[in-house]
A protein has these predicted regions:
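Single conserved hydrophobic/aromatic residue that forms the stacking wall/gate
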Residues: 1-11
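Extracellular/periplasmic periplasmic-binding protein-like sensory domains
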Residues: 5, 19-23, 35-105
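Short, well-structured alpha-helical segments in soluble
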Residues: 9-19
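Structural motif
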Residues: 25-27
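Short acidic, S/G/P-rich loop/turn micro-motifs used as interaction or catalytic elements
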Residues: 30-34
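Segments of small-molecule ligand-sensing domains
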Residues: 94-105, 112-165
C-alpha cells in the first residue's frame, strides 16, 4: 500500500512544467548528446515543443534512428558532397575517410586556389588572407576576409528518421 501511494505522488508532480524558452542548444556529440537530450525529455523539455539544436553531427545515423529526440537541427557540411567524397576516398584507399582528411583535402585546394589567384607569388602571405574572396571546396564554400576564413555551413533537420536540408 505504501509503495503504490508513493508512486501516485510521483505521477501527480510536474517536473519543470511550462518552460520560458523556445530552443535548447546542446553542444555535444554521439552518446553524450543523446544522454543530454533524453534527460531533457524527463524535465518537460521536448523537441515537439522546443527546438533542439546541436553542433555538427556529420549525419550521425544513430540520431536518425532516435525518434524521441526528433526533430533536431544542426549545421553541417554539404551532405551530398560528403557522400561523394566518402565514395571516392573508399574507391581509392579501400577504407572510409575520417573528418580530418576532408578538411585537409579542402585546405590543399585552398592553398592552390590562393597561389593561382596571386600568380604563385606567396611572398606576401598576409595579403592572401586580407583580400576578400571565396573558395568553393569539396565540403562547401569558404569566405576569406580580414585574415579570417569562414566556412558557410548548411543547416539540417532530422525528423521522422530522415535528414532534410533546410538551407
Amino acid at each position: 500500500p505504501t509503495e503504490s501511494r508513493g508512486l501516485g505522488d510521483v505521477y501527480k508532480r510536474q517536473t519543470l512544467g511550462k518552460v520560458n524558452f523556445d530552443s535548447v542548444v546542446i553542444a555535444d556529440f554521439d552518446e553524450s548528446l543523446k544522454s543530454v537530450a533524453t534527460s531533457l525529455l524527463y524535465s518537460d523539455v521536448s523537441p515537439d515543443k522546443e527546438y533542439f539544436i546541436s553542433l555538427n553531427q556529420w549525419f550521425n545515423e544513430s540520431l536518425i534512428q532516435e525518434e524521441s529526440l526528433q526533430p533536431m537541427y544542426y549545421p553541417s557540411i554539404n551532405k551530398k558532397n560528403w557522400e561523394n567524397y566518402k565514395e571516392l576516398f573508399y574507391k581509392k584507399f579501400k577504407k572510409y575517410p575520417n573528418h580530418l582528411s576532408l578538411l585537409s583535402y579542402d585546405l590543399v585546394g585552398l592553398i592552390y586556389y590562393l597561389s593561382f589567384k596571386y600568380d604563385f607569388l606567396t611572398s606576401d602571405i598576409e595579403k592572401l588572407f586580407k583580400d576578400e574572396s571565396s573558395f568553393k571546396g569539396k565540403i562547401g564554400i569558404f569566405d576569406i576576409k580580414n585574415n579570417e576564413i569562414n566556412h558557410r555551413l548548411n543547416f539540417y533537420k532530422i525528423e521522422k528518421n530522415q535528414t532534410t536540408e533546410i538551407f
